Amino acid sequence: MLRQLVGDAVTIPVILKFYMADQNIRDTVYGKKKFRFSSEQAINIAVTVVSVAALGIAVNNIIAMTSLIQASEGFQTANQAFFAGAAVYEFLGSCFLIPIAEELLFRGVVYQRLKLMLGVAPAIICSALIFGLVHANLVQFLYAAVLGCLLAFLYEKTGFFYVPVLGHIAANTEIGRAHV
């Protein structure tokens, strides 16, 4: 997990550069979206974050009811390696840095670029499938693809990048909490 943590810490600034360049182009073409934070928005964000975490739990429970986890050597290996480190590294990595890095890449860059080429719905589906594929085993593919669809949808509906980031952090934290 320490290697993953360091890798994400190094990767985030690189992906952030691409995200910011794309964002500057979008702001120039479509105009800059103003950030307004109200109590209503805070409630909506809280409900959204809890909903994403609940979806993560639901998808994990559905997958657990099948024989996929036992049948997937790739998942077993990845899970053992992922949760083999110290708890502080697991928390910082899986609950904070990894969601930020993945959201920058998959919703911030991949989804936004696919949306320009394909439109909203195909971009949501394609970016979610790509997000699932990079998780490299069937169990995590299913979980990540479902979560990826929801996160891209939330990003599209709200227009604010922090919404899928907070949702992803909540989902990973809830899953991580189950392993601690």
PLM region descriptions:
Residues 100, 104-105, 109-110, 137, ...:
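Active-site His/Glu-centered metal-binding helix of metallohydrolases
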Residues 128, 140-177:
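Functionally important transmembrane alpha-helices
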